[in-house]
Regions:
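Terminal leader/tail segments of proteins
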Residues: 2-3, 36-155, 159-194
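N-terminal secretory signal peptides
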Residues: 1-13, 17, 21-31
């Protein structure tokens, strides 16, 4: 699959803006939404692997909706080994955030899973902030986890950029999928079988 076009088999109406970002706030609460019963979009693909809707949920902070998260994964997805599987995570924002704020919060959440030295933290923060756009309510962004390669981010069907580091990518998507997440209810909603 070309990195530019995981949307080659979708309708233009479904080319919404996407992101996987780290705005997961430690004190927030999540509310599970119904599974993907009404989503009629064709499956996403990553390197020829179909990714099917898996689950969705809302990220809330003191009752305020921050974003809605949706997970796509291939058949055979094992949440305990999320970094070994191709997957996609969409976040649709209900609030305004700068790319820099998203990147900094993402690194805080990634450090919940494992220690990250200051040099690597600064490098990853800068790379992520350079790839991500600022977001406002209604913006959706999509992140693809490419095992053994890294993360790719898209908005509106176009590639924003990549962070070509599989360790970064595994930890980044672990913000939502790792058992060490600050949002276990959101994780449960995302990994629920559709």
């Amino acid at each position: 699959m070309s990195c530019n076009s995981p949307w080659s088999n979708t309708e233009p109406w479904s080319r919404r803006r996407w992101l996987a970002s780290g705005v997961a706030l430690a004190a927030a609460s999540s509310t599970a939404l119904p599974a993907w019963a009404t989503d009629s979009r064709p499956p996403l693909t990553l390197r020829g692997t179909p990714l099917l809707p898996r689950g969705e949920g809302q990220m809330r902070f003191f009752g305020l909706n921050i974003y809605t998260a949706r997970l796509w994964a291939a058949d055979g997805f094992d949440p305990a080994q999320h970094a070994a599987h191709p997957l996609a995570l969409e976040l649709t924002y209900a609030r305004t955030f700068s790319a820099r704020d998203i990147a900094e919060r993402s690194l805080q959440e990634m450090k919940r899973q494992t220690p990250i030295n200051k040099a690597r933290e600064a490098d990853w923060t800068n790379k992520l902030a350079a790839v991500l756009p600022d977001v406002k309510p209604g913006d959706s962004l999509l992140g693809f986890h490419r095992p053994d390669q890294g993360a790719m981010f898209q908005s509106g069907g176009r590639t924003l950029g990549t962070v070509d580091d599989p360790v970064f990518s595994g930890l980044f998507f672990g913000i939502w999928l790792s058992p060490a997440t600050s949002e276990p209810a959101l994780r449960t909603a995302l990994i629920a079988q559709r």
